[in-house]
């Protein structure tokens, strides 16, 4: 299957995701990792060389822009935007990091079991969450996207073969219960995976609280009623304290409201300097202020 990614700069080109704990470990704690608590620190010569090369390329920007057409200018601008972001990242790597009491270099993970059984997916999710949490604690990253299962999920209940996506369409609604029992069982197990994700963030002590107290996690499904791919009542959750900015523990029912309001709320709670979000009829400047402290 083609890997799923929601990380994009242009809306058309998406970043390649790390699909295994080992790949994520190498990205966060592999070559070039600078332990913020190490007494011995010096700039990485390889980073200095890369910064020098990027600076030389950037200096040629104006010459290139004058010699190409409008369509190529757009492509070049995207390219140079990526270069500027990379230069900023390299500049950070050349600065001595501030000490981080919560940062502990994790052990290299073992090769995970590869199966679509939701219990296996949840175990792998916990491993990935542990690495991501320590990546935040060590200031290796401040924002990330994580996909537990894709929109057409191929996970299944242990011991069975019928996949989640197929069950949502084939299973009838129980006459007495008023819902789909097997679908609900799978949804419950997926939420257990989300709970495990939060537990790993909450397990790291940071200051007077935990890492989760200082973070915000925005989680969502892509349908409200999967059987018919309904876009009404899509479940969206905000977890974590966001450094005291998030008033958690509330259920807000907002029928007919744009889901982009929740996205805008999450970004503002996380400290992003953004006043509106979305496109066309989904564009909004109204965050959900009920959850803002």
Language model segments and positions:
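Ligand-binding pockets and gating/stacking loops
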Residues: 1-293
């Amino acid at each position: 299957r083609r890997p799923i990614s929601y990380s994009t700069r242009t809306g058309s080109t998406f970043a390649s995701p790390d699909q295994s704990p080992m790949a994520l470990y190498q990205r966060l704690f592999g070559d070039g990792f600078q332990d913020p608590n190490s007494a011995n620190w010096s700039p990485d010569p390889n980073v200095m060389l890369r910064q020098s090369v990027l600076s030389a390329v950037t200096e040629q920007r104006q010459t290139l822009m004058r010699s190409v057409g409008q369509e190529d200018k757009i492509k070049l601008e995207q390219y140079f935007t990526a270069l500027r972001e990379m230069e900023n990242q390299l500049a950070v790597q050349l600065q001595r990091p501030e000490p981080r009491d919560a940062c502990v270099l994790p052990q290299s993970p073992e090769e995970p079991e590869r199966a679509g059984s939701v219990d296996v997916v949840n175990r792998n999710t916990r491993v990935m969450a542990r690495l991501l949490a320590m990546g935040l604690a060590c200031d290796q990253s401040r924002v990330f996207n994580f996909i537990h299962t894709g929109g057409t999920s191929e996970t299944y209940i242990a011991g069975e073969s019928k996949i989640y996506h197929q069950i949502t369409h084939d299973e009838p609604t129980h006459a007495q219960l008023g819902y789909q029992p097997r679908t609900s069982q799978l949804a419950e197990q997926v939420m257990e995976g989300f709970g495990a994700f939060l537990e790993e963030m909450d397990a790291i002590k940071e200051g007077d609280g935990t890492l989760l107290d200082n973070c915000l996690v925005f989680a969502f499904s892509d349908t409200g009623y999967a059987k018919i791919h309904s876009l009404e009542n899509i479940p969206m959750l905000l977890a974590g304290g966001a450094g005291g900015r998030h008033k958690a523990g509330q259920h807000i029912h907002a029928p007919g409201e744009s889901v982009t309001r929740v996205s805008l709320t999450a970004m503002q709670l996380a400290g992003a300097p953004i006043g509106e979000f979305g496109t066309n009829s989904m564009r909004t400047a109204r965050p959900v202020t009920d959850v803002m402290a």
